[in-house]
């Protein structure tokens, strides 16, 4: 029931000049083998009508082969149990893949952390957040060209992709520029 009512918000970000980089077959293969969508979350902002910081988070998780959907709400009063509601249900891998593919249509930013390479995806950050973990260990410091290869591959799936690192920022998707004018 909660699932059927979910709607993907319209991505809200400016179109910038695109850079194009064709990924090598070897790199794309390695990337695909190590790319998993581990968590998808809708984050709904406060309820302005009631003036309460009411939030609803619908979160998809995939861990150890088990896919779950969790719906959690809060009306902003952290002192009462009645103000919070949480329910988790197990969903099939097919349902999980269908939802994550449908939702994966927004700005993508790239970060590196101690656990691997983490892609955090934002469309309208006030509405929702999608996080994609790329479990990939490189035997060398990842280069700018390799980072472009990664994000360019994702852009071929039909998403507007941004790559952000500590040292530089790229927007590497170009195929939908004309359609969006």
Show where each model-derived region lies.
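Phosphate-end processing signature that detects enzymes handling 5′-triphosphorylated RNA
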Residues: 1-181
